[in-house]
């Protein structure tokens, strides 16, 4: 029985990419800088001491990081029994965004430039926003700037509730984000507005429109909910998910995976939010999974709650929680199963600003007949997609080199 379980630790980079200089990210290292802060006692909120990830270390995380950066992260070393194959991967895609990282690891790198809204203020063309407002029957909007999602709620959430005007904002990524209150504005109305925006953005080459619903009564208790939706453009070519589906296999999306791939190549969608719920749902889907199945989970909290918010202790705390539950996954695997843990980009919580960082990502592989040891530097995330194709005996992807024997 052949089953692939992909656990995407969203934003968990392991050191600057070869082209980090082009992004202003030289020195970024999500894993390494978190470990350093923990070792120095600078991440003791809700946890304390050095970063403890014994199960990820056994899968080769520390060793992959050493190969990426030249040194072990603080608290990690050679004194561990390695049970998995480990490597580190550079990104071929032009951007350091979520769709690019996900599509590339599924065999389809993004070799063109996304469109971006580069101006920090007055970010959106008036022609665009006028069309969106006219179609939605709205009198105006708030925001029109680059911002963190939490900060913009503090600044504009009350005015939004008072006026009914949606909040439009963006970031360094190729995104158009819309924040609205679930009750005063309405969740379905927000989704409808996002669909309109997605259609009007067709000529701007923007990767995603993101619905950012929130609840609360004021800045002190405004909170984004788990009802986020991403409206992505479709990948430019069939991914390994599409190929497995076309071959009669099953592809199970847990969390926001389906949205990231614009629902292409997905046969089943499982909604889950929060680290615990996502892990629980992954376990349940692995238990149910039959032959020729991919179970694919994005653990978004690492990125959205801790990376972008530059919360080092929160990121460390969640990594330790994730690590503590890994044995539950390992216990469900058959000899022929293929477990793959990776990331889509970096988001170093010690880095200036609030944007992603251009980093290498871990490639931690277990099962599928792989011997424990180094996979070395992978020149593209697409090596993972090629390996999945090889494992499931699908026709080869155009990009990537497999590290799994078919």
Swiss-Prot record:
Main location (coarse class): cytoplasm
Keyword Phosphoprotein on entry: no
Reactions performed catalytically: 2-deoxy-alpha-D-ribose 1-phosphate = 2-deoxy-D-ribose 5-phosphate; alpha-D-ribose 1-phosphate = D-ribose 5-phosphate
Pathway(s) of this molecule: Carbohydrate degradation; 2-deoxy-D-ribose 1-phosphate degradation; D-glyceraldehyde 3-phosphate and acetaldehyde from 2-deoxy-alpha-D-ribose 1-phosphate: step 1/2
GO terms for MF: magnesium ion binding; manganese ion binding; phosphopentomutase activity
Positions bound to Mn(2+) 2: 303, 308, 356
Enzyme nomenclature, EC number: 5.4.2.7
Family annotation (Pfam families): Metalloenzyme
Keywords assigned by UniProt, alphabetized: Cytoplasm, Isomerase, Manganese, Metal-binding
Subcellular locations according to the entry: Cytoplasm
Top-level EC class as recorded in UniProt: isomerase
Binding site for Mn(2+) 1: 10, 344-345
Cofactor entry: Mn(2+)
Family in the record: Belongs to the phosphopentomutase family.
Protein name: Phosphopentomutase
């Amino acid at each position: 029985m052949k089953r692939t379980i992909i656990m995407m630790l969203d934003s968990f980079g392991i050191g600057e990419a070869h082209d980090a200089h082009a992004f202003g990210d030289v020195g970024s290292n999500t894993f390494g800088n978190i470990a350093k802060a923990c070792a120095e006692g600078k991440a003791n909120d809700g946890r304390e001491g050095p970063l403890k990830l014994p199960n990820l270390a056994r899968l080769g995380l520390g060793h992959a990081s050493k190969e990426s950066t030249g040194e072990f992260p603080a608290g990690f070393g050679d004194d561990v029994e390695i049970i998995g194959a480990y490597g580190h991967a550079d990104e071929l895609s032009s951007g350091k965004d979520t769709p690019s990282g996900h599509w590339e690891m599924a065999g389809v790198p993004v070799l063109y430039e996304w469109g971006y809204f580069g101006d920090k203020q007055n970010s959106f063309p008036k022609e665009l926003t006028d069309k969106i407002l006219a179609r939605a029957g709205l009198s105006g909007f708030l925001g029109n700037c680059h911002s963190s999602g939490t900060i913009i709620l503090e600044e504009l959430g009350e005015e939004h509730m008072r006026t009914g005007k949606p909040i439009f904002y963006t970031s360094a990524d190729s995104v158009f984000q819309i924040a609205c209150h679930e009750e005063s504005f309405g969740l379905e109305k927000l989704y409808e507005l996002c669909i309109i925006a997605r259609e009007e953005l067709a000529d701007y080459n923007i990767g995603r429109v993101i619905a950012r619903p929130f609840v609360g009564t004021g800045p002190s208790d405004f909170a984004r909910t788990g009802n986020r939706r991403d409206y992505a453009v479709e990948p430019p070519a069939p991914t390994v998910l599409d190929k497995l589906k076309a071959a009669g296999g099953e592809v199970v999306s847990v969390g926001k995976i389906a949205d990231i791939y614009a629902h292409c190549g997905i046969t089943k969608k499982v909604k889950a939010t929060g680290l615990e719920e996502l892990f629980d749902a992954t376990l349940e889907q692995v238990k149910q999974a039959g032959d020729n199945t991919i179970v694919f989970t994005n653990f978004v909290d690492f990125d959205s709650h801790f990376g972008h918010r530059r919360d080092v202790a929160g990121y460390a705390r969640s990594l330790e929680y994730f690590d503590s539950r890994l044995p539950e996954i390992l216990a469900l695997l058959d000899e022929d199963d293929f477990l793959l843990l990776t990331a889509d980009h970096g988001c170093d919580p010690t880095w200036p600003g609030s944007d992603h960082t251009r980093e290498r990502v871990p490639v931690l592989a277990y099962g599928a007949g792989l011997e424990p040891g180094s996979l070395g530097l992978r020149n593209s995330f697409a090596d993972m997609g090629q390996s999945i194709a090889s494992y499931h005996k699908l026709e080869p992807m155009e990009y990537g080199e497999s590290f799994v024997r078919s």
